[in-house]
Every structure is written in C-alpha cells, then in structure tokens.
Amino acid sequence: MAMHQFKAESKKLLDLMINSIYTNREIFLRELISNASDACDKRYFKSLTDTSIGITKDDLKIHIQPDKDSRTLTITDNGIGMTKEELEKNLGTIARSGSLDFKTENQSDNIDIIGQFGVGFYSAFMVSDKVTVITKKYGEEKGVKWESTGADGYTVTECDKFKPGTDVIMHIKEDTDEEIYGSYLEIWKLKALVKKYSDYVRWPIVMDITHQEQQPTGEEDKDGKPIMHTVNVTAPETVNSMVPIWQRAKTEVTDDECVEWYKETNRDQTDPAAVLRINAEGVVSYKALLFIPGKDIDNGISGAAKKGVKLYCNGVLIMEDCDKLLHDYFEFVRGVVDSPDLSLNISREILQHNRQLKVIGQNLEKKIKAELEKMMRDDRPKYETFWKNFGIHIKCGVCDE
C-alpha cells in the first residue's frame, strides 16, 4: 500500500496546525461536526435539483459513536460523500477547503456552508494518533478509505461502503499526565461539547444513549403483581437543539419564550428589563437576540468581568464573550449575535479585525440606545431601576467618549 505525502510542507505545517493554530483541544469536535454538517448541506442542496438522490431533509443526520473498548470516536454523516479524487484533493492538501470550492462552483451566497479554510479536519490529530476516513460519494459504486497517523503521510484505498456519506474514525491517544484524552470517549463529555459548540447546527446530532428502565420479568409475586427488574436500554437520542430561538420567525416565538431562554442561559431568575430581537439584511446580514438585564448579574463593574454577548457564525459558536462587539459601557447587555458574513481566522477561534464586526457593533449600539430612550420616555420607573443598576456603566461611557 503506497504512502502518499501531504502536498503542503508536510510535517512542519501539520505540527503548526495541531499545536499552534488551535489553542483548545476540545474544539476538534466542533470542527468535525461542522464538516459533517457541510456534507449534509451539499447533499440536500443537490437533492433540490436532482430527484434521483432519493433523500429528504428529514433523513440527513450526524452520528457520534464513542467506543471505549477500541478507544475510537467515530463521527458519521449521510451527506454527499467524496470520490477518491476529492478525498486526495481535500485531505491530501492541507488548508484546502472542499466546502469553499462547492460554494464557489454553485455560485450561491444562499448556501450556508460553514467550512472556509480546510484545516478543521486536521484538528482531529490533537486528540488522535491515527485517523481513518471511510467515504462514498453519492452515485459511486465503491467507497474510499483514507488513513493517516499524521505528518508521515497517508494511504488511500478502495473499500466497500453500502451507503453514501462519511465516517471519520479517530483512534484516541493514550492519557498523559497533562491530558486525559479518554474523556473524549465519555457520553457526558461529548454531549457537553455538542451543547457548547454545535447545539444550533441545523442537522440532528445523534448519540446512542443508555438509560435504565423498569421492565417485567415475566414472573409474579405472591399478590399476583408482576415482578419488575432494572434493565439498561440504549436508544438513539438527538443531543442538539438544531434551530436556535433567534433564527425562528418572530411570529413563532413569544416574548415569554425569549424571557425563559434568557433566564435559563444566564442563570438569572429576574425578568430582563428589555428584549431586543433584530434581523438585519444588507451588506452585512445578522440576527441578534439581546437582553438588558433586570438587575446587575455581574454584581458591579470589574475590569475582569466578561462581556455578555455570544457570537455565532451560521449557528456555530465562535466566541463565548465577544469583547470586540460592544463598548465596555454596554458590557451588561446579554444575548447572541449570529452572522454568516464574519471574517474568521484560519482556526475559527479568533475573529479577524474586520469591517463587518464593526458595522454589526455600531448597529447594535444604536438599537440599544433607542430601546433605552424608549424606556425612559414610556416607562420611567423601569428606566430609573435600570439607571440604579447600570447608570455607572453609562457614566463611564460618557467619560470615555
């Protein structure tokens, strides 16, 4: 079996990507889920013009399967799949993006493909000492198997695969004193990472979850009642929410639902003083759901206090506390902003300083100021409570300006 070399500067570049581009190992799951989501997007997009594809939107999904015995973690999708040529082109050339090629070839800004740079797949090597990819393109007779242990290169062979889609099989590293790699085989850990980074990916992310049930043994006690025993039952469970509340139409979401979502995500049982729902389209498109809290949940101002706005790109969490979005005097504002137009750096971990983010921030601040002016005019007691809680922030802002 011939060993192929990566087409970029091999070992040095791969080491750079694994050890420098990504600063947080756990994001490997976000990257692989994003790739799987892209594959499902592509198959769905093709199915709109090719009825022979024979799959509906409801059929597409992503499956996560840990196996402690074999120490593997498998991410499976039933998306478009890849041919041998596409596999070598996309995985054999570091920093090449098949998703970007697909979007360019189809010349549509309406295709919400997450991947841009083609390096996310290689984040798997941060937690794996070997990665195996088994894939089959829709319409192809045979599947293809790609395998690599890292910078030494990779092998590509034909294989049998019944259905279109892709399996990414990670052979998880052994634990060290510094890192418990085996934690990435724990159901609770994987569910937490999906919830944190990929909860709003549009396709179902499914895991086989085991829970206990009481079932009859077939015997009866002396009173004629069935004797029960506890059994473990494993069943597929969707572990992501898929459609975020801010992406749903205003007519589908009540103010009470927004308030409950705020309370749950911010662990604040006080109703927010104001809710802002924003849907902007134009040069920069974005959706935002912002809240002015009913009390100071940071307990005062502090230079170390985190900002309250989370930033998403196409439903994937990019930054938990985006301090580049709003001025410090609005750090009490909570909520989310989701935009497909953000310019990210190569690892998607850090935003590049760009005009889009500045435009979004300026527009949001105008909306917040307008809401506060409306509150001051229409509900003076509520505004006075707001001022008591956050007036010092606004005063600091006046001084800074």
Where do the PLM segments sit?
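GHKL (Bergerat-fold) ATPase N-terminal catalytic module, capturing the glycine-rich phosphate-binding loop
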Residues: 1-187, 192, 215-217
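GHKL/Bergerat-fold ATPase module in large chromosome/replication-associated machines
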Residues: 113, 131-153, 173-401
